[in-house]
């Protein structure tokens, strides 16, 4: 049963993680709805000059698509379906299951079983029981 709980918890956590990733985008990507920080706006729009004035050129033997920026791709995958076992697959879709036996050797409870009458306990304590709380009249203990 613990394994079923672990599967359920992982299912919920993965679903929450994926839903939050789809709403805010992956880490490190720019959110176009958020304004840019006003600290240094020029660094966002223009490339910084190379202090050594070295131009990096694209080699001729490598295809151009390797140098392109990848597009942001958010993939929303629903959590996997909960698998309950083969015995549930065999049932028709509208089958009502009144109870599920945990152990097959136990009969289901009957509506007509009478409860066992209970005995009243004796309210007076036995003579050898001593009261040792601080509220007892002759208490020698100090708490």
From Swiss-Prot:
The ranges of region (Disordered) come to 28-50
Superkingdom classification of source: Eukaryota
Query: Keywords for this entry?
Result: Detoxification, Secreted, Signal
Q: Where is this protein localized, as stated in its record? A: Secreted
Name the GO terms of the biological process aspect: response to toxic substance
> Has UniProt tagged this entry with the keyword Protease?
no
Q: Name one Pfam family in it.
A: PROL5-SMR
Read off the InterPro entries from this record. Answer: SMR-like
Query: Where does the record locate the signal sequence feature?
Result: 1-22
Polar residues composition-biased segments: 36-45
Gene Ontology CC annotations of this record? extracellular region
> So what does this one do?
May play a role in protection or detoxification.
What is this protein called in UniProt? Submaxillary gland androgen-regulated protein 2, isoform gamma
């Amino acid at each position: 049963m613990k394994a079923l709980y672990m599967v359920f918890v992982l299912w919920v956590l993965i679903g929450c993680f994926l839903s939050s990733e789809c709403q805010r985008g992956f880490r490190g990507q720019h959110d176009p709805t958020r304004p840019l920080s006003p600290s240094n706006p020029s660094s966002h729009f223009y490339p910084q000059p190379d202090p050594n004035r070295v131009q990096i050129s694209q080699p001729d033997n490598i295809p151009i698509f390797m140098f392109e920026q990848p597009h942001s791709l958010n993939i929303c995958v629903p959590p996997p379906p909960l698998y309950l076992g083969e015995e549930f697959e065999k049932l028709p879709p509208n089958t009502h299951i009144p109870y599920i036996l945990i152990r097959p050797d136990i009969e289901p409870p009957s509506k007509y079983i009478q409860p066992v009458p209970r005995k009243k306990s004796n309210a007076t304590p036995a003579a050898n029981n001593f009261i040792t709380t601080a509220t007892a009249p002759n208490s020698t203990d100090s708490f």
